[in-house]
A protein has these predicted regions:
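Pre-Walker A adenine-sensing motif
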Residues: 42-52
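Charged, amphipathic alpha-helical linker segments immediately N-terminal to NTP-binding catalytic cores
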Residues: 1-37
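Conserved small/polar residues in nucleotide/adenosyl-binding loops
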Residues: 127-129
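P-loop (Walker A) phosphate-binding loop of NTP-binding proteins
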Residues: 64
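Walker A/P-loop
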Residues: 70
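Short beta-strand-centered segment that lines the nucleotide-binding/catalytic pocket of NTP-utilizing
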Residues: 84-98
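ATP-binding Walker
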Residues: 67
Length: 129
């Protein structure tokens, strides 16, 4: 029987390393142990228990800008790969933003708000991909 404790012992170093890479000097994650043990690992178990080797599973994560979607999905991906030995592909809206240089040009030529990621018009269109 797989357990949260067993999983935590196998993934904690990688999780903490990833979290450290996301922290800044002024913004630190609080309650990292609790976040991993009480939320991220149980969610990973939930996903793993519903996975079917015959079909591709798609899991979506929604939330506002800066709410931790990338951090959460990256750590869950890490847990699913390392502990459950799943093949995981993660994609983020961040992967489809125009470059900073492109957004700067748009902000000068069209509107200053286009410098900010997330504003309509700052994503690559399917034609450009």
């Amino acid at each position: 029987m797989q357990s949260v404790t067993e999983c935590y012992s196998k993934v904690k170093k990688d999780c903490f390393r990833y979290i450290a890479s996301q922290e800044t000097r002024t913004e630190k994650f609080k309650n990292k142990d609790k976040m991993i043990k009480s939320f991220l690992i149980p969610v990973s178990f939930y996903i793993a228990n519903r996975a079917n080797k015959e079909k591709t599973m798609i899991v979506g994560l929604a939330g506002g800008q800066g709410t931790g979607k990338t951090t959460i999905s990256s750590i869950i991906k890490m847990i699913l790969e390392k502990y459950f030995k799943f093949n995981v592909f993660k994609i983020s809206i961040d992967d489809f933003y125009k470059t900073r240089k492109e957004r700067l040009k748009l902000s000068k030529n069209i509107h200053p708000l286009l410098m900010t990621r997330g504003v309509p018009g700052t994503h690559l269109s399917l034609i450009h991909i």
